[in-house]
Amino acid sequence: SNVILADEINRAPAKVQSALLEAMQERQVTIGDETFKLPQPFIVLATQNPIEQEGTYPLPEAQLDRFVMKLLIDYPTGEQESRIVQEAAGGPGGRGLDPGSIETVCTPDDIIKAQAACVSIECVSAVADYAVAIVRATREAAGISVGAGTRGAISLIRIGKSYALLSGRAYLTPDDIKRAALPVLRHRITLSAESTMTGMTQDNTLRAIVDSVLAPRQ
């Protein structure tokens, strides 16, 4: 499959998480003595239940670092929720959501072309240095016990390039890096116990860090 959805990944035992880590890092899976290359593109999406922690297996930092972004999904708007309820409750037996009705919006080749277009976005050294400075600041900031690694800076630039592409630009700007900072870094930092007790969050901490790092002139 080109797209894998690991639902409530923190409920998967360590052995399953390890297998997923191999797939994400090596782009291959090993079954017994055989190794199978994965198709391209290969995209992994995973969900976590932030409320129910009983019976879960916390993901190790090395595996969290393999995920490019962490998105926070809130409740839908009233209009969206009404549509969900109507569609889910419609049809025979109340099963109105028919998987067969899903329309294709892009092909694997389309994704590969989009990835190539992102790679071609220009990133001058000043903007790359800015991304590195933000990541390095997470390692020195008060209230953070574990800061982001080098993969965090790489992901900042990659996601920043995707924002530039979606904005119709052929070059990366500091604003693209700022926009990418929270989704790219929130799962890559660990707050100290003292910070957590005072009500600090990853997002609040990262906003303060981004504000403190001088951005290059555009």
Question: What are the roles of these predicted feature ranges?
Answer:
Residues G96-A153:
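Conserved AAA+ ATPase small/helical "lid" subdomain
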Residues K113, T138-Q218:
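C-terminal engagement/docking regions of AAA+ P-loop ATPases
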Residues E8-V16, M24-I121, K161-L166:
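Canonical AAA+ ATPase core
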Residues G78, S82-Q86, A128, V132, ...:
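An amphipathic alpha-helix signature
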Residues L59, Q80, E122, A126, ...:
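Alpha-helix N-cap and coil->helix boundary residues
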Residues S1-L5:
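Conserved alpha-helical scaffold flanking the Walker A/P-loop in AAA+ ATPase domains
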